[in-house]
Amino acid sequence: EIYTLSLHDALPIFGAGLPHVSIPRRAVNRIVLTGTVGLSAGARSWALYNDIDVVFLSRHGNYLGQLSGPRSTTSARRLLAQAELAENDHARLPLAQAIIRAKIRHQLNVIHRAGRRDRAVDITTTCGLLRTLLADTGHAGTIDELMGIEGAASTQYFSCLAALVPDDVTFPRRSRRPPKDLANAALSYAYAILLSECTGALIAAGLEPSLGVLHASTDKRPSLSLDLMEEFRPLLVDRTVVSLLRSHRLRPEHATASEDGEGIWLNREGKKALVDGYEATLQRRVKGALPGFSGTWRRHIHHAAQLLGRAITEPDYEWTGVSWR
């Protein structure tokens, strides 16, 4: 179903003659367009003038790109620092280790929280293995070794997470291209949205998203965005998806098979349920997750991007990630 979206005293976003949804301008801080959706020239100008990011996702939720206003504060000094770090595997290893440590810590916390609600699932073995892998990050001598530890942790983590979803949801393991079941379809779709959030936050912080620390720099992906989102994957996406599945707000009928039968994608109702849950998570206010900072999780992503910028440009700054219990 296609809607005409307009802003009070502003511009129509989609063509005339379609169902109409009205939203106050002050309530808009980002426009996400999914699939083959048009955006008028007037709407583009309004968004750019007001520093409203316009994010484009494919109909399957893959991040395609975005329009961003002139607020980008990328400086030559910061860009040079990023480039120098990206080309020095030895120099970027400590920050890469910190990124993976933060991710594994949050994976542990997600399992602990879900396990407390479902005593029938034994999380002891998985938690023990994750703690061992968490300690191993400090002994990784190369980025490749570190990525191997991260992969091992994710395998253990998703295996345990699969036991925490309802019996009518098939979730044997993490599958990506394409996702093979409802849980994986929801994770992939939400990760794509989170990637756009992180890319926008990095641009706002004056950083170049393609120059990564953990993920190798390339023109084909926003590597630093993937770095920033690592710790937020379990924190914001995984626990949201598990919560939606356990509360049956996301159900098997919300998934549909691809035309070639190779993958599973969310249908319109599934996307709405997921986006509603994701937005509720990002609008939740938290305090103490970052030193001296409080606000919504969305604001935490932006603040975390600024701190990541400090870690890149200030060698003595120790980046530790978000603290979440």
Across the structure, where does each feature detected by a protein language model lie?
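Short helix/loop capping segments that flank catalytic or ligand/cofactor-binding pockets
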Residues: 13, 41-42, 65-66, 197, ...
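A surface-exposed, charged beta-strand/loop segment in the N-terminal or early-internal portion
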Residues: 27-30, 34-109
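Mixed-charge, polar/low-complexity N-terminal
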Residues: 12-14, 18-20, 49, 168, ...
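Single conserved hydrophobic/aromatic residue that forms the stacking wall/gate
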Residues: 1-9
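N-terminal ordered "arm"
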Residues: 10-36
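Active-site helix-to-loop segments that bind/position phosphate- or nucleotide-bearing substrates
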Residues: 6, 22, 76-325
